[in-house]
Curated annotation (Swiss-Prot):
Pfam families: Chromate_transp
Topology with respect to the bilayer: Multi-pass membrane protein
Claim: Transmembrane helix is one of the keywords in the record: yes
GO cellular component: plasma membrane
Family: Belongs to the chromate ion transporter (CHR) (TC 2.A.51) family.
GO MF terms held by the record: chromate transmembrane transporter activity
Gene name of this polypeptide: ywrB
Protein name: Uncharacterized transporter YwrB
Cell cycle in keyword set: no
Membrane spanning stretches: 11-31, 50-70, 79-99, 108-128, 136-156, 158-178
Listed PANTHER family: CHROMATE TRANSPORT PROTEIN-RELATED, CHROMATE TRANSPORTER
UniProt organism field: Bacillus subtilis (strain 168)
Assigned keywords, A-Z: Cell membrane, Membrane, Transmembrane, Transmembrane helix, Transport
Length: 197
C-alpha cells in the first residue's frame, strides 16, 4: 500500500475541521484519532507533548497542532497545507451561510444537533483524559500523579489560573524531576560499579 502523505494529511485535517463542533476541546480527540490511531504519524507521548505546548502558546490549539503535524510530515509546505485543510472548509461554509446566521443561531434544528453531539464529545474527551491519566500515573507513580491532579484542578478550577501558566509550571517541574532522577540513577550505577571493582 503506497504512502500518500499530502492526501492523507489533507483528508485528516478536513475531517477534524468539519467535525470539530464546539471548538478546541472537541477537535483534540479527533486529531488524536487521526494522528495517533489511524495514520500513526506520532505516538501518544508525542501527542501529549504537542498538546501541552499548544496549550501554553496563544491562539487556537487545533491550528497549532495541525501546523505541527504538517511540518513533521512534509516540512513548511506540509504545515501550510495542513492548516489550510483544517480551516478552509469551515471558513468557506461560514461565508456561504453568513446570510442565514441570524436564522440558524435561533434554529431548533441547529440547537438539537449541537445538543446531540455534545455527549459524544464528552465521551471522547473522557476516554482521552483517562488514557493520559494512566500514563501520568505510570510515569510519576500513584501518589505524585494524584497529587498533581489535585494541584492542577485547584489551580485551574478554584484559583482560575491561566491554563498556559499551569502547563508551563508543570513542564518545568517535569524536566527538573526527570533530570534529577537520571542524575541519581547514574550516580547509583557508578557507585555500584566502583564497589564491584
Amino acid at each position: 500500500m503506497k504512502n500518500h502523505p499530502y492526501r492523507d494529511m489533507t483528508a485528516a485535517m478536513v475531517r477534524t475541521g468539519i467535525l470539530g463542533f464546539g471548538g478546541g476541546p472537541s477537535v483534540i480527540p479527533l486529531i488524536r484519532h487521526e494522528a495517533v490511531n489511524k495514520y500513526k504519524w506520532i505516538d501518544d507521548d508525542e501527542f501529549g507533548e504537542i498538546l501541552a505546548i499548544a496549550n501554553a502558546l496563544p491562539g487556537p490549539i487545533a491550528t497549532k497542532m495541525a501546523a505541527y503535524l504538517g511540518f513533521k510530515l512534509k516540512g513548511t509546505l506540509g504545515a501550510i497545507v495542513a492548516i489550510l485543510a483544517h480551516i478552509l472548509p469551515t471558513c468557506l461554509a461560514m461565508v456561504g451561510l453568513f446570510a442565514a446566521v441570524n436564522v440558524l443561531s435561533h434554529s431548533a434544528i441547529v440547537a438539537g444537533m449541537i445538543g446531540a453531539v455534545t455527549p459524544v464529545i464528552a465521551v471522547m474527551l473522557g476516554i482521552m483524559a483517562y488514557e493520559f491519566g494512566q500514563k501520568a500515573l505510570k510515569g510519576f507513580g500513584w501518589v505524585t500523579g494524584i497529587l498533581f491532579f489535585i494541584i492542577a484542578f485547584i489551580g485551574l478550577q478554584t484559583l482560575q489560573i491561566n491554563p498556559g501558566l499551569v502547563i508551563i509550571i508543570f513542564l518545568a517541574y517535569g524536566a527538573f524531576h526527570f533530570k534529577l532522577k537520571d542524575k541519581i540513577t547514574n550516580k547509583h550505577s557508578k557507585d555500584k560499579g566502583m564497589s564491584a571493582s
